[in-house]
Design a protein with these regions (language model features):
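Internal alpha-helical transmembrane segments
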Residues: 228-259, 263-299
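Small-residue-enriched transmembrane helix-hairpin modules in multi-pass membrane proteins
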Residues: 17-30, 34, 38, 42-65, ...
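Helix-loop-helix junctions and helix-breaking kinks within/between transmembrane helices
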Residues: 108-123, 240-266, 377-384, 426-434
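Intrinsic-disorder-associated, low-complexity terminal segments enriched in Asp/Asn/His/Tyr and depleted
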Residues: 3-10
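Short hydrophobic/aromatic segments of transmembrane alpha-helices and their interfaces
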Residues: 30, 163, 235-239, 366-368, ...
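Residue-level signal for alpha-helical transmembrane segments in multi-pass membrane proteins
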Residues: 80, 167-174, 222-225, 241-248, ...
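Membrane-anchoring hydrophobic segments
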Residues: 10-218, 222-223, 229, 272-275, ...
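Alpha-helical transmembrane segments of integral membrane proteins
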Residues: 158-162, 233-236, 382
Length: 455
């Protein structure tokens, strides 16, 4: 009798596990919709009680409570696009997932709780973003207008290695007098001082391109093959390269990125299919669970510090920055892309005396933001969002095409650094200064023996 009862319990647990697994799978569009609704509701609660409740003083952060009708519209706008997500089938799906979680949901929410009587502006912005969100997920599925772009003759991998070494030597030769190693966990004040000092140094002018190309293109590319071939000495040398970059820019992301890439590679390699179908659930449920912990343990100093980094500066940052940009450019002139140096060099039409991020924050901070804000709202309002949305859509199609012969495991690592830039900088800065354009050229022009068809 006891054995039969235990067997029944195991069967019930097995069935429940199957049901939960099915709901959390990206193949279930209804599960995606429900998870997006839950995530959006938790996001709203944390934005109201943590971001707005505790940090409203950092800028023009609004929270106008939504009516029932507006809440329903907000939930539909937030959740319907995610029903089109079907897992990481192409690299554009990887871009679109992070863009959805850390740009789209905060953007829609921030517009819905904005202190504004201009409903036409609010709903037109939201509708355009809604259409683009659906298109971005669509292009990551089966729809492929351009297939397999490959430049011939192909450049051998050895040539990329030599170029990487040469660029590293040039970087060290230029920046060696400004290199310092600082513990990112215990010596934060010195880290910020050195970061500011190096950023203002005239002798380091122009080195940003070199650093961005190494960080976002060359180092990830060689790291993938070294991990694939288990060339551990060369893996360590690549880590050393990242540390050299960190010793100049003093950015925590630069120091942590190689470790993130290696861990990500190993996780995806263990079960590529499961990661492809469930990575969205892992990320969203982790944020939901952490938000619950913050709610219960918000008086704990350690929890509060982590929450400030994870929620204020990562999950919700696009939300309050959206409100900063919308408020600012409702009252001030658009840049018409003159915030991009090369365009301003030709037009000499940039309307502000300080960089865009500082202008928007009225000099109180450097409010760098995602490309929908910098290259959209700041550049031309609704028209700017339409232009940059179409540009990004075209870019996703191109990236899908050049990466079609690569394994997903490799693509996760290759494009992770540039995805991290997409979330807080101009799309043109990401392409030119942070390595996306060189990476795209390398992927299209190089034939490495771990290239294979995507599954």
């Amino acid at each position: 009798m006891v054995y039969r009862n235990n067997n029944t319990i195991y069967q019930i647990l097995f069935v429940m596990g199957k049901i939960i697994s099915n709901i959390l799978s990206s193949k279930n569009k209804y599960g995606n919709f429900l998870l997006a609704c839950l995530y959006s509701l938790v996001y709203d609660y944390m934005y109201k009680n943590f971001v707005y409740g505790l940090f409203y003083y950092i800028g023009r952060i609004d929270y106008e409570p939504m009516s029932i009708e507006r809440t329903i519209i907000w939930l539909l706008l937030s959740s319907i696009p995610f029903a089109e997500y079907k897992g990481i089938n192409k690299i554009s799906s990887f871009f679109s997932l992070f863009l959805y979680l850390f740009v789209y949901i905060p953007f829609i929410h921030s517009m819905m709780v904005l202190y504004s009587d201009d409903n036409l502006q609010i709903y037109s912005y939201c509708l355009v973003m809604f259409i683009f969100a659906i298109l971005y997920f669509k292009v990551g599925n089966d729809w492929t207008p351009i297939k397999n772009i490959m430049v011939k003759p192909q450049i051998p991998f050895k040539a990329i290695e030599y170029i990487t070494i040469l660029l590293t030597i040039v970087f060290v030769a230029i920046a060696h007098n400004h290199m310092h190693f600082v513990n990112i966990f215990t010596d934060m004040s010195r880290l910020y001082d050195l970061r500011s000092e190096n950023s203002e140094s005239e002798s380091l002018a122009g080195i940003g391109y070199l650093q961005g190309w190494l960080f976002g293109a060359f180092y990830p590319f060689v790291l993938v093959l070294y991990l694939e071939k288990k060339k551990w000495v060369k893996v360590l040398l690549t880590l050393a390269g990242y540390i050299l970059l960190f010793m100049v820019d003093m950015q925590k992301m630069t120091f942590l990125m190689p470790f993130v890439l290696i861990i990500l590679y190993q996780i995806v390699r263990l079960n590529e299919q499961k990661v492809s179908y469930y990575i969205h659930s892992y990320i969203m449920l982790t944020i939901i669970c952490f938000s619950c912990i913050v709610y219960v343990k918000q008086d704990n100093e350690l929890i509060f510090t982590i929450a400030a980094i994870l929620l204020l500066r990562t999950v919700c940052v696009a939300g309050w920055l959206t409100q900063l940009y919308v408020h600012f450019f409702t009252e001030n002139p658009y840049t018409y892309y003159s915030h991009i140096n090369i365009i301003n060099y030709v037009t000499q039409n940039y309307p502000y005396s300080v960089p865009l991020g500082k202008a928007v924050a009225y000099g109180s901070q450097n409010a760098n933001a995602n490309f929908f804000l910098t290259d959209g709202v700041a550049a031309g309002g609704l028209v700017g969002i339409c232009f940059i949305g179409i540009f990004f859509f075209t870019l996703l199609i191109f990236i899908n095409s050049i990466s079609a012969r690569y394994k997903k495991t490799d693509l996760f690592v290759l494009f992770m650094p540039t995805i991290s830039f997409f979330l807080n900088t101009s799309i043109f800065t990401t392409m030119l200064s942070n390595g996306l354009l060189p990476l795209a050229l390398i992927v299209a022009c190089t034939n490495i023996n771990n290239c294979t068809s995507s599954k």
